[in-house]
Amino acid sequence: MTPVRPLRLLAYAVLPLEVVLVGCLIGGVRIPAVVLGVAEVLVAGLLLAEGLVYLRLRRRGLSRRDAVAELVPEPVLRLVGHELRLLASLGRWVARRPHGTAGADGVFPHARDQAALMYGFAFVCAVETVGMSFLLARWPVVHGIVLVLDVYTVLFVLGLHAASATRPHVLAGDVLRLRQAAHVDLRIPLDRIASVRRETLFSHEKADGELNLAVGAQTSVTVELTAPVDAPRLLGAPRPVRVVRVHADDPQALYRAVDEALTRARTAPSPDPGPPPRV
């Protein structure tokens, strides 16, 4: 057995215990110093062991990304990566720097129809933050923790919209890239597309093999594939799809661009095979 599996099992036991202890301390529960000391030693030992195994994996030739992937479960990595992408999207949104559009043949924003709803959510969260600050003013520890959580909630909601605003659908070369916020990034080769059509839908029933990237509860372009393409879920579970429905601020432009790209790809002349070999 490699040392990675025991470390993961230890982390699953130690980290929840640490969370419970923190919750007890916040709630005013008196915990013996011995218990706190043992918990801190376990956490420090776990971090030290993780660091040593990481160095060992690096010496075996693994890249930084691969070494971290060996130590940390994929769902945890994907969740952390998602949160980091949301925070990075806020910076891109302020700087007006869209993601993944360099060298694109077509860029198709899709966040306009959700903007009012997301701003409304952010406003409600901000009001709730102010209200909780007044209600918890007598309990400074609880007030501080709830304030951090509330502020992060506001940033999270704004980050969701910022991720959609800075990650448009992109047509580049022979690949159609369809995205939603920071959790869906689907690359479809044009030779996998059977058909594309302009189709506005406001209700979507869940079905195997279908992916609906609705914005404002609507989709406006439907892409059917000749073979399944994997669209991993948030935690990494595979999700093969053969029908993808998306929305764009200008759906006609997206439909026209994809349709024209398909026509060019299918009518392109075959390469010259060259002269026959001499016998």
Show the residue positions of the predicted features.
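N-terminal membrane-targeting/pre-transmembrane regions
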Residues: 1-8, 52-138, 273, 278
